[in-house]
């Protein structure tokens, strides 16, 4: 019982810290909360969180070629040229504050291309578990965290996965656009959703 209370107090303390960071970020950007009810976490706030514990950031892939009139990069099942530019811009901004992270993607052309352009040369590990959503995605995240408990993790996945996580963890309706993301962390074997990543 005492152990449970300590764990509960620690979780509450972390949540209060997260709220404070989100509020501070909100003063300098737009609002601390998105319209969907998720806390907004920008690069600087994310960097502060990463100093407390490793973070897991899941991004939707960049603009799909087969659903756009923009020029394709190559394969029609991949992303557009505009998508590569957007992914590189996001990656540059992200890496400026979180330079050290392990990179993963699902096994589709569009997520692999997005992760490749985001990383600018960082090693990419393709993991088909990030194509399927549901409780399986939590198991995959915890597995990666167990293998490298001190590393930040970036995962390129799909909109339905992000929508599922937001609804399951915070009962939030999240309809991610290209390259939108969620910030999570693992604590004592449980996966927590901290908020929505916003790039400024």
UniProtKB/Swiss-Prot annotation:
Enzyme class name: hydrolase
Signal peptide from the UniProt entry: 1-25
Keywords: Hydrolase, Periplasm, Signal
Family matches, as CDD domains: HP
Major localization listed first in the record, in broad terms: periplasm
SUPFAM superfamilies: Phosphoglycerate mutase-like
Pathway annotation: Bacterial outer membrane biogenesis; lipopolysaccharide metabolism
GO cellular component terms, semicolon-separated: periplasmic space
Entry EC no(s): 3.1.3.-
Subcellular location per the Swiss-Prot or TrEMBL entry: Periplasm
Gene Ontology molecular function: any one: phosphatase activity
Xref: Pfam families: His_Phos_1
Matching InterPro entries: His_Pase_superF_clade-1, His_PPase_superfam, LipoPS_heptP_Pase
GO biological process, one term: lipopolysaccharide metabolic process
Similarity-based family: Belongs to the phosphoglycerate mutase family. Ais subfamily.
Record's function text: Catalyzes the dephosphorylation of heptose(II) of the outer membrane lipopolysaccharide core.
Protein name (Swiss-Prot/TrEMBL): Lipopolysaccharide core heptose(II)-phosphate phosphatase
Organism field: Escherichia coli O1:K1 / APEC
Encoding gene, per UniProt annotation: ais
